Amino acid sequence: AHLKDEILFLSEKYGGGSIERYIEKLINHRNTRCVERALYQANDDLKDSKPAEEISQTFVNTIAKSLSQRKGVVACGAASKQAYAEFLEVDAGGTQAISTGLPKLDAILGGGFKKGSLYVLAARPGVGKSALAIQMTYETAKRGLRTSYASLEMTASECAGRLLSNASGVRKPTSKGFLQPGHKQKLEKQVQAMQSWPITFKDDSTSTLQGLQAFLAKQRLEGELGLIVVDYLQLLGVPGMDSRVQEISLISRTLKQIALEMDCSVLALSQLNRALESQNRNPMLSDLRESGSIEQDADCVLLMHREKEVDPTKDNIICNVAKNRNGEVRATKLTFTKPTGRFSSQEPEPSLHQKNPF
């Protein structure tokens, strides 16, 4: 009652517009105080001779978290109106979700990737999970949304090379004179177009969770992000932790928190257990390496594998949406053109009317 009286008093005295300006000033003051505290802490850490990299990462993470625009409390009435608006948007054929560029996969995901959600894309090596993630990065950037690609096994130029082949349709040369007439012009035109794409790559050797957080925090300070890709989850480490299971649990939980705090989609690539190759069966959620926490924290898990009856002229890939917190659980068939790293939807779809064919 006391708070309500204060709000009514302010409304009568200053008017609605003035209250909004007053709240904005309070937020700015809070952020300023947070920066001051972070600076004092960094100064104390320097006096204690802590490593400069650790101090820098902690400082950036603190600032980025404090400047998060997510609200701590949302009234049920406001949330229900937002939910209803989203229902109507989807019903009308529109969506705020980020398209994967694969219409049939989008249909299963409810339009594509959603803000605040953690997606896990898992496969054995060589199936094409990095290629698919690169393509999804390209599709996101085409829509003008900022994307950060954090590869822990490829350099920025290697990632960009895959992106260039995917977008241009020209495979990477493997020998002298490999490029055909017209290929250079295609590549040059594509490179020119890529100058304005809102994509950044992580290009350093750090593979710690804290290092990833610092990289993403810097990106967030430069503006809102649409999609974050982490390639891949098992390569991340947390110094000082004894148990790998606990380490993976912290990593997956942190990635989910990043999606929520930065209000964006996070796509984390993951390995499947090696034993799967000798068991002659399709992958399941339990095949995720250190699977318990990954499966629990993810909003959606996509499992990729090659179709058993393989056409020698192309790779047929089954992408099974094995967990989907906000949609259907079923599979879609993709064609993978390996030389250019390009995926496309196939006809017909595999077992579309079954709840889960695997």
PLM region spans:
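Short, well-ordered beta-strand core segments
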Residues: 147, 266, 301-303
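Amphipathic alpha-helical transducer elements in NTP-driven molecular machines
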Residues: 16-19, 32, 99-102, 106, ...
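Helical hairpin unit composed of two closely spaced alpha helices linked by a short loop
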Residues: 225-268
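Conserved H-loop
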Residues: 152-154, 264, 269-271
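Cytosolic-facing regulatory segments adjacent to core modules
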Residues: 107, 139-224, 238, 331-335, ...
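C-terminal regions of RecA-like/P-loop NTPase motor modules
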Residues: 209-228, 254-262, 275-358
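The Walker A/P-loop phosphate-binding site
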Residues: 71-170, 189, 357-358
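Short, small/acidic-rich helices and loops at N termini and domain boundaries
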Residues: 1-91, 115, 126-127, 169
